[in-house]
Amino acid sequence: MSDNLPWKTWTPDDLAPPQAEFVPIVEPEETIIEEAEPSLEQQLAQLQMQAHEQGYQAGIAEGRQQGHKQGYQEGLAQGLEQGLAEAKSQQAPIHARMQQLVSEFQTTLDALDSVIASRLMQMALEAARQVIGQTPTVDNSALIKQIQQLLQQEPLFSGKPQLRVHPDDLQRVDDMLGATLSLHGWRLRGDPTLHPGGCKVSADEGDLDASVATRWQELCRLAAPGVV
């Protein structure tokens, strides 16, 4: 053989596949990206958003506070109004009762005044009767006034009423009221059963007794009920 290759002893390693050449792996350097700072416009926008959010939350809080305050005021006013209404309704019976008591007390005072006056009158008349020994009489002027009052009540009498007086009063009554009695159709008569100063009127409807004895009994009855 005419090859010019040098001769080399064969070994078993010659059958193994050739080993690859070791090449170190170089990892790529990490790219560090620095975060860029926000621009002025972004900062302003962020501030606006924060201000808007704060204003929104503040508005909600203020609205809640105002609503709570208004509700409290309305509730207080309603409570006061209801309390006043209940107080008035509770005081109404008490007020009515007090008015009734005042009215009854005034009626009692009026009645007491009347009783005192009647008792004083009864005592005075009784004292006069004890002194003079008979029922005190009134003068003719009182009798004339009494008859004039009876004449004013003429519509109460029909027909020809008859006026009776004590004989001692007959002449004076005739002189003072004779013409008036005749004008009204009244007849004047003397009645010795009457006390001086008293009179009676007799008509179709009945008698009207204004005698001194009758008035005396009435005064005593008012002064001491149940005694006379």
Curated annotation (Swiss-Prot):
Main location: cytoplasm
GO cellular component: bacterial-type flagellum; bacterial-type flagellum secretion apparatus; cytosol; type III protein secretion system complex
Keyword Protein transport: yes
Residues making up the signal peptide according to the UniProt record: none
An annotated GO BP: bacterial-type flagellum organization
Keyword Transport: yes
Domain of life of the native organism: Bacteria
Keyword set, alphabetical order: Bacterial flagellum biogenesis, Bacterial flagellum protein export, Cytoplasm, Protein transport, Transport
Record GO terms (molecular function): cytoskeletal motor activity
Cell compartments where the protein resides: Cytoplasm
Function of the protein: Needed for flagellar regrowth and assembly.
PANTHER family membership: FLAGELLAR ASSEMBLY PROTEIN FLIH, YOP PROTEINS TRANSLOCATION PROTEIN L
Family membership: Belongs to the FliH family.
Protein name: Flagellar assembly protein FliH
Annotated gene: fliH
